[in-house]
Amino acid sequence: MLNGLDEGIRVQVSTTVSGAESPKLVLESVQNIFPDFTAGVLVEPKFGTSNNYQWENEQISLNNFNQMIHKQANLDTALYVMGMKLRNDKTSFQLLRQASIAQKIAFNLDAGNPLGGVINVELTGDNLADWLEAATWHKGRDTVPKRINDERKMDFDGEPSTWI
């Protein structure tokens, strides 16, 4: 299984803990997808106080993330979302923490900050498009080939642009 690090991909994962959010639950939601992710001291908010943390880790393995998108069979969605902002061998995307706390992968396609927050992921590396296609490959692509930004890509609102 491709993990990004062994293939020369720079992986940066970050999230924000704010307001009355529980740092423990936020960390759990991130670690459900990225088990190597670490955070500093976890101080639960008390009534009348709020949290404001920005957590960021670099060189995080994508192995568990890749296993999850394969198991949950959302490889084409993953390819399209991860490829939407691909420019000059760099891309970024967001995962919904509300889904990750339940050990599911769901991508944030909205520009705002949804209920439960997001996990920000940035990938940088030579031939990143090829790596994304390899990491999300499945047998169905033998019959219906797909590539980043092909005519079958989904629109920015998540709707399919064509049906087969």
What does each of the following model-derived ranges do?
Residues I9-T16, R87-Q94, I119-V121:
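Short glycine-/aliphatic-rich beta-strand segments at the starts of folded cytosolic domains
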Residues L62-Q103:
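Ordered, amphipathic secondary-structure segments that act as subunit-interaction surfaces
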Residues S29-F37, M68-L75, H138-R141:
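Conserved short hydrophobic interaction patches
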Residues Q103-I164:
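Glycine-rich, aromatic-bearing surface loops/beta-hairpins
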Residues M1-V41, P45:
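Long, hydrophobic N-terminal alpha-helical segment
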Residues G40-N63:
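Short, charge-patterned binding micro-sites
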Residues T15-G19, F34, R97-I101, L123-N127:
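Beta-strand elements of well-folded, non-transmembrane domains
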